[in-house]
Amino acid sequence: MKKITFGTDGWRGLIADDFTYQNVGICGWSIASYIKESLINERGVIVGYDTRFGSKEFAIQISNIFLSVGIDTYLVTEPTPTPVITSEVISRGCDMGIIITASHNDWKWNGIKLRNSKGLSLDKEELNLIEKKSNARSKDEIIKLYSGKLKGLLTEISPKDGYLELIRSKLPISEIRKSDIKILNDNMYGTTLGYLESLLDDSNSSIIVDSINNYINPNFPDIIRPEPIEINL
């Protein structure tokens, strides 16, 4: 097994090479172990995922690990942007947010991004501790973990509407809707599908939103990677 190495926000790996069900399970157990040992509030976690290959399935796998050790888990019902998960962690007062995503990397990658109760990246010491746990676990220990009865409470959530309401409370949306502008919106086959349209939608609005790459495709065709840089726009 390749060594699991954490970067600034979490761990990323090549799908089917080192980012596998076995390694995701080991990493998930290590995160769960850290939460049980270090976070005394036990306020639950939120698990999200993006539109990449297997992201939803990996999110379900990690959720089951958390449940098996008694961690209440909120699992999103659709691919969700990381800032939305972060906002939901704060509003619900959860211990942590875990997102299955490789951010702007190309289609061959996936990853596990972590956010603390304040919506921030975990500090280096915390990540080092989880990394150390990840590389000390064996496959047999993970199998034993799945043999237990689920003990945590699973709640499925859809945080999109609440997040859009938060944005509306921060911006003069009614004035923006009167601006009579046309917006070209590139969703890059990702998690923002429908967000801008929903935010600005109103029968009296004069804004036109023209969206492209407005469907899920984990291959991210015609772009190098899902990142708003000049070569992709």
Feature map (PLM): residue ranges:
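Short glycine-rich phosphate-binding loop at a beta-alpha junction
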Residues: I40-D50, K182-N185
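Glycine-rich phosphate/diphosphate-binding loops that line cofactor/substrate pockets in enzymes
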Residues: G28-V45, I142-L145, P172-K178
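Short strand-loop junctions, especially beta-strand C-caps/beta-turns
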Residues: W11, D50-R52, S117
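Gly/Ser/Thr-enriched, mixed-charge loops and adjacent short helices
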Residues: M1, L14, N110-L233
